Amino acid sequence: MKNNDKLDSHTPMMQQYLRLKAQHPEILLFYRMGDFYELFYSDAKRASQLLDISLTKRGASAGEPIPMAGVPYHSIENYLAKLVQLGESAAICEQIGDPATSKGPVERKVVRIVTPGTISDEALLQERQDNLLAAIWQDAKGFGYATLDISSGRFRVAEPADLETMAAELQRTNPAELLYPENFEPMSLIEHRHGLRRRPLWEFELDTAKQQLNLQFGTRDLIGFGVEQAHLALRAAGCLLQYVKDTQRTSLPHIRGLTMERQQDGIIMDAATRRNLELTQNLSGGSENTLAAILDCSVTPMGSRMLKRWLHMPIRDIRVLTDRQQAIGGLQDIAAELQTPLRQVGDLERILARLALRTARPRDLARMRHAFQQLPEIHRLLQPIDVPHVQNLLSQVGQFDELQDLLERAIVETPPVLVRDGGVIASGYNAELDEWRALADGATDYLDRLEIREREKLGLDTLKVGFNGVHGYYIQVSRGQSHLVPIHYVRRQTLKNAERYIIPELKEYEDKVLTSKGKALAIEKGLYEEIFDLLLPHLPELQLSANALAELDVLANLAERAETLNYSCPTLSDKPGIKIMGGRHPVVEQVLKEPFISNPLTLSPQRRMLIITGPNMGGKSTYMRQTALIVLLAHLGSYVPADQATIGPIDRIFTRVGAADDLASGRSTFMVEMTETANILHNATEQSLVLMDEIGRGTSTYDGLSLAWACAENLASRIKAMTLFATHYFELTTLPEKMEGVVNVHLDALEHGETIAFMHSVQEGAASKSYGLAVAALAGVPRDVIKRARQKLKELESLSNNAAASTIDGSQMTLLNEEIPPAVEALEALEALDPDSLSPRQALEWIYRLKNMV
């Protein structure tokens, strides 16, 4: 049955459902019926699969059974959370009419639309992770990109110039939901993502976007936000804002401005670099053993989210970084003490967003009150700290004595979950509410008196007075004594072992009590809305306070981490270069069972590239990554895992470290490696930090060596980037003799018989030999295989003595036309052969072919 069949053939209720469904054809419609939300037709089938709920049928409409699935109203949030995680959206349709006065179906309407990117309910959100809605636009000039965190009001735009930059932005922001125009061309960029929403082109119209944004911010133009000429970004922002208004169906007073994010303000990292450095997600997709896992001991969820934003967008403004460093230094002695009241502040940022959307629940207001109660202690602790940035943040934190007093007077100590449960507003706040409550609360005494009186008067020891939601108040008598009740007892309900009655006096009291309860609840709801009206004018200061408290949490956390993990304050210099004494890998040193071996590093204009050799497992990758992480931490304003560090200007960090086949895109390991390498060679500058690990290993020996040599040469002589170049090609250790600014270093190892000990210490000069066979033995490769490998190694070394590999003149190498010595070519062909698969004739042909080669 299709939802758009002629409405006349359906029952009135299904007609109502189909009209509402027609307004929301793309998303699941949860249709309130009594104590359940029901889904019908294709929605029911889809929901039963997505949510693992039973698919049933409900009667018939238009002569056919109606597929139906449903969930209880009290557990709707759990099901919505599951849908949101799957990238799905849902429209929630409530009964707004009174069943008692309705003719035909009760009036219903969609009161909210839940989508992955627009949720603000704490039950649906991940506490320590941003939840972003994003929109993307693209034309010949580049990309426009907008993100909004509705749970904080943080609205950002950017204009990535090319596909690689756009891919990095998508990975950095990782939106829960992404709006894109119907004519979007590079679908490969986004098609693997959850929560994609295709939008019509007119929603990205520029003039409409400017109009919408000015209306939202109460401005005449967007010049004050610095985005007036950012036309690509504004198109995306306009579509995004319209979508939020459509789904939220309320004003959005907490979205008060727009910030342009410019690449040059931060250290640029492409998608591969973010992945390889394992900032917030490890290579397996989890969060264990990441930089965030070590660094994030924030005590508020909003602080944790801010720290992760800092990790993904390190900044270059030395003034801001110095402010943060000084604040961390100033907070070190009181960090633990400060974290006690901060922990009690909770997630004020998201509570304020729900207040702005008028969806804050009673417990949100109780938490807000509790947060206000912590502010005097925070002021007491921070006032003596003589650091300008700390005092600036403290002034933004403010004090909200009047609002605290309001919430202390208005909201009970431990409120219920929902306003409709009643009992939210404290006694003494409103005289009229107290009167109606007294009437309702007096029921218990009256009912006790009535029960005793009737039991004694009639001599019925089984008589008792009770109440249920369906039949209201009743007098219950056991079946055995029911023949003794007087005539004015009117039967209301028959049970298996008892009869329930009503009498005029009880009916009159029931009407009075139910009226008083209903009246009290109506007054309470009105007062609750009034409290919103009293709080909302203070929203800008409250948001500023929440942001300052989050930053204080991050800084106190970084102060505690610096003290606990023995980090030092780096020096940020305007002179090019990186000098690290006793550098350590922040994650590896925490995971290792034995002590971590710290290492120095020096890069300067005269020492731009380190060629790093040494055994596999010797620590080359760790040494390279720790350098990048120390540089990144310094540009958070954090202390760093080193005895001492001086960091010059850095504009980008690139990593070409390890690779796996990208099967989904049909790209081999080598193709992935070369794509990442091309990106580095096109975009690195003199101020970039480049990590190149084992470049060229995904192809044949000579192809790989040629590529590695040419890349190293290009980075050192043309780009002049600060480069750490790890390689297993010993031929590259001759580069320092041919080029300025290139230096050999190696990681030490000691070999004894067939065993090897990795020293993990970095020494000047090239490694003296390779330790591949020793590492293979350590990995458990059978002894006879190792023995055979040693024999083979000797043969190959004797064969290669005259080969060009050992005497390559790098200045004469070209990338594609290097001649491979015949003996080596024959050896490679022989190694590729499978003798068991050859027929006698083929084997004979191969013997002649190999003879011709040599």
UniProtKB/Swiss-Prot annotation:
One Pfam family of this chain: MutS_I
Gene Ontology biological process terms, A to Z: mismatch repair
GO cellular component assignments: cytosol
Residues that, per the record, bind ATP: 614-621
GO molecular-function terms, A-Z: ATP binding; ATP-dependent DNA damage sensor activity; damaged DNA binding; mismatched DNA binding
Cited InterPro entries: DNA_mismatch_repair_MutS, DNA_mismatch_repair_MutS-lik_N, DNA_mismatch_repair_MutS/MSH, DNA_mismatch_repair_MutS_C, DNA_mismatch_repair_MutS_clamp, DNA_mismatch_repair_MutS_core, DNA_mismatch_repair_MutS_N, DNA_mismatch_repair_MutS_sf
Gene3D superfamilies listed in its UniProt record: 1.10.1420.10, 6.10.140.430, DNA repair protein MutS, domain I (3.40.1170.10), MutS, connector domain (3.30.420.110), P-loop containing nucleotide triphosphate hydrolases (3.40.50.300)
Physiological role: This protein is involved in the repair of mismatches in DNA. It is possible that it carries out the mismatch recognition step. This protein has a weak ATPase activity.
Family: Belongs to the DNA mismatch repair MutS family.
Name of the protein described by the UniProt record: DNA mismatch repair protein MutS
